[in-house]
Amino acid sequence: MSDEFSLADALPEHSPAKTSAVSNTKPGQPPQGWPGSSPWNNPSAPPSVPSGLPPSATPSTVPFGPAPTGMYPSVPPTGPPPGPPAPFPPSGPSCPPPGGPYPAPTVPGPGPTGPYPTPNMPFPELPRPYGAPTDPAAAGPLGPWGSMSSGPWAPGMGGQYPTPNMPYPSPGPYPAPPPPQAPGAAPPVPWGTVPPGAWGPPAPYPAPTGSYPTPGLYPTPSNPFQVPSGPSGAPPMPGGPHSYH
């Protein structure tokens, strides 16, 4: 008895698996249960290519562009570009320093045009104290009190204030004031004379030409919005008094 054990020895003589294996096998043809040439049973066979792309096509020549890479290919990349982060804040001053002293202007500005022309109207005279001479050359020496002369006063010499153009009232005797009147008495009339005759209007007022109507009850004018009374069977008007039976 042999020590080797085979599957064919364990199956019964009339087993369907054993019968099909024997009956369906033909010389030079592989069994139908196994596929043909594949990388597993034929290492020298070329790998199968998907039917979507030709064998000569490369990812760069695909009309949709190269295949995306990364953890999530469908999401576009966001954020700062790859590389070391920029220093914050940036080094250096916030504004550039000035470039140095500015050069002098090449075109000088307009200078003085010379003496100014004589004005076409005289300047207004400055106010001077009262009594001062109009000509400054004729003014005498000033004393400690401004325009007052330090010397004695001449008879016709003007003082600090001008001579008034209207004489002062004379200090002669004035008429005595009237004596005080008793309360309730009419004061005397100091002007004119009182005309003779009675005081009052020249004639009495004329009487009225007609008498006014006696006040009394007047008829009420007709109301254009008054609703005429209807027959007894007519319905009451809206808003009017209602009779409850």
Swiss-Prot record:
Modification Phosphoserine, positions: S2, S6, S15
InterPro entries: MISS
Low complexity composition-biased segments: 34-43
Biased composition (Pro residues): 44-57, 74-127, 164-190, 198-207
Disordered: annotated span: 1-245
Residue(s) carrying N-acetylserine: S2
Keywords from the UniProt entry: Acetylation, Phosphoprotein
Keyword Chloroplast carried by entry: no
Family as reported in the entry's similarity comment: Belongs to the MISS family.
Name of the molecule in the record: MAPK-interacting and spindle-stabilizing protein-like
Source species of the chain: Macaca fascicularis (Crab-eating macaque)
Source lineage: Eukaryota, Metazoa, Chordata, Craniata, Vertebrata
